[in-house]
Structures are given as structure tokens and as C-alpha cells.
């Protein structure tokens, strides 16, 4: 699947961004039935700026509480022709964008009943826990109908489980860098460069 041309259909960065917008539009009607409160903060999908794209991962930047700056889901696209659709595009959108980080952070900032340290402070366990939970809502939100996208979501889950094993291996069992890289490469479809990046992050 990593090399099959059917999974790299894009020619331009705009086509990749349009694919994410299609995910957004597909799940939006379902989100409205699941959430009775949605953020006032607007939302955009943008390509990561060229100056930082090589070292960036897909990420969410929070909007401003007063709504003057939108929340932005950034997607690094170095070469659209190699952008693989099986990498869990739908699960990534659910995690980083809606209802993941965009809903959680925006609603938290907009809640004037919360003390400021709770409105603007980050609790990473909660932030990431919510985003991971949102990935599990794919089917309820009209996504994961393509078996390859669902497989991508399961692959993301496996990757996180492997990260936990490697973390314990390195910090408790004394694994070397090479042992950690080898474990990742033997238990998931990750390149050596990808495994090195994970170990050294």
C-alpha cells in the first residue's frame, strides 16, 4: 500500500487540502447531531508553510478566544504526488481538527465560566486523550467507510501502542537506540528514517 499508485492520487497540494475538506464536509452533518454546543471560533485547513514543512507534522493551531483568528489544521505537503491516502487521513482529521483539538481547545477558551488558568492552560493528558477518543468516533461521524482509511486508523492505534512499549523499553529496561528502532521496524510498517525520527523526537 505504501508504493501502490492508487493510494497516491494527488498532483497538487490543493488536491490534498481538498481531500481533507471533503472529509470535513462528510462528517459535519453527523457532528451536529452529536454535539449540542459547537465552537464559535472559525476553522480552516491550510498547507504548512514551506519554511517549516520539512520538520513539521500535521498539527492544530488554536484560534483566538474572541474569534478574530481561526483555528487552523496545518498539513505539511512536501510532494503532493507522494502523499499517501492510506496514512489515516480521516483519523488524523478527527484528532487534529474536528471534533478533536479544534472543539476541545476552542470550547475551553470560549467558556467564560472557567477560571483563566483552565481556559488558556493546557492539560496535555486531557487534550490528547480527547483527541484520541475522537478518532474512535469515525464510523459514527460517517467516516471509515473506506476499508483503507479504517486500516489507517487502526495503524495509528498500533503505532501509539508501539510507542508505549518502546518508551518503557528504553526508560525502564535500558534498551539501546538500535533496539528501540529495530522493535518499531519489526512490529509496524515504518521506515528506518521514520523509526529514527520517533526515537529521537
Name what the model sees in each region:
Residues 1-201:
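N-terminal maturation segment of proteins
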